[in-house]
């Protein structure tokens, strides 16, 4: 089982994949995130944020107010399982999180917290046996 995946985006509000499966056998899971576009992060910046599906609306709404310096994620938000910085065209980043933070009975959503991107840039993540 692979304990990492790569998600890409570009100068549109889309992710390259709509779903991610995390093997339960992994201790940690890494998401490599690449922006293959050309626009700067101030114009079309993206990130990858993971939370329980039930929480994402509030996490995104509150994160938008946290500002660019905080990558549009509220500092210390316990509902956020993992997130990457906001990146622009040609940049890449990654985030690693403990698989023990996930439950197989829970639904998770990953999304971009850049203001206005949340409704289109999202996907599902699930823990697999």
UniProtKB/Swiss-Prot annotation:
**Can you tell me which residues bind Cu cation?**
46, 112, 117, 121
Q: Which cysteines are joined by disulfide bonds?
A: 3-26
Q: Which GO terms describe its molecular function?
A: copper ion binding; electron transfer activity
Q: What induces it?
A: Produced during growth on methylamine.
Q: Which UniProt keywords apply?
A: Copper, Disulfide bond, Electron transport, Metal-binding, Periplasm, Transport
User: Which InterPro entries does the record match to this protein?
Assistant: Azurin (IPR014068), BlueCu_1 (IPR000923), BlueCu_1_BS (IPR028871), Cu-binding_ET (IPR050845), Cupredoxin (IPR008972)
Matching Gene3D superfamilies: Cupredoxins - blue copper proteins (2.60.40.420)
Q: Where is the Plastocyanin-like domain?
A: 1-129
Q: Name one Pfam family in it.
A: Copper-bind
Q: Entry's PROSITE patterns?
A: COPPER_BLUE (PS00196)
Any one cellular component term from GO for this entry? periplasmic space
CDD domains under this entry?
Azurin_like (cd13843)
The superkingdom listed in its UniProt entry is: Bacteria
Q: Where in the cell is it found?
A: Periplasm
What does this protein do, in the record's words? This methylothroph organism uses azurin in the oxidation of methylamine. Iso-2 is probably the acceptor of electrons from methylamine dehydrogenase.
Designated name of the protein: Azurin iso-2
Source organism (scientific name) = Methylomonas sp. (strain J)
Classification from the root reads:
Bacteria, Pseudomonadati, Pseudomonadota, Gammaproteobacteria, Methylococcales
